[in-house]
Amino acid sequence: MKAFLKILMVLVFTSVAHAKNPSTLSKEEEVLQHLQSFSAHFKQVLKNEKPLVYYGVLKAKAPNWALWVYEKPLKKEIYMNDKEVVIYEPNLFQATITPLKDKTDFFTILKRLKKQDDGSFKTTINKTTYRLVFKDGKPFSLEFKDEMNNLVTITFSQAEINPTIADEIFVFKPKDENIDIVHQ
């Protein structure tokens, strides 16, 4: 009888421990957990009185590097790391370097996302709520309200999970020696 009770207790303990530590993650949660790099074309829509639409390419790499290359309607490059943001505007011959006050880089947002009942993922960082939707097992759209309370929707296409990306692309190197560099 004692042996039976010991076996029963072990089985109960094992089932309780398993229930508290579910090892099954959704496909999307697996992607987020193992994401080390990401590349995609994007369409960014800023919804206000007159919607603004931008197109470009995003390349991001853990732990916190991102390069947003805007191609239309104006060319712009945004380099992000854990310390600063560099916004290079070739048409203005200007690069603006700003210290990053808050951890709002692409990977920080992705790592903090929590799955919602509707299947989307959400997180709030510094009073900004980010919502990510997956499609076909890959990030598809990211929504948030900017500091002016405009809704921003970024839709990804041709997304690649964990592509090989060289570290050098995340370092701003002036392409023209005549540009103004502004430190804020």
Model features per residue range: what roles?
Residues P90-K127:
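Flexible, surface-exposed loop/linker segments and immediately adjacent secondary-structure boundaries
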Residues V10-K20:
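Hydrophobic h-region of N-terminal signal peptides that target proteins for export
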Residues K2-V10:
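Sec-dependent signal peptide recognition
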Residues V53-D105:
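An acidic-aromatic
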Residues K114-Q184:
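Gly/Pro-enriched, hydrophobic low-complexity segments
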Residues L32-K50:
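A short, Trp-centered hydrophobic/proline-enriched beta-strand micro-motif
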Residues N48, N91-F93, M148:
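Solvent-exposed strand-loop boundary residues in beta-sheet-rich modules
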Residues A19-K27:
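Cleaved targeting-peptide boundary
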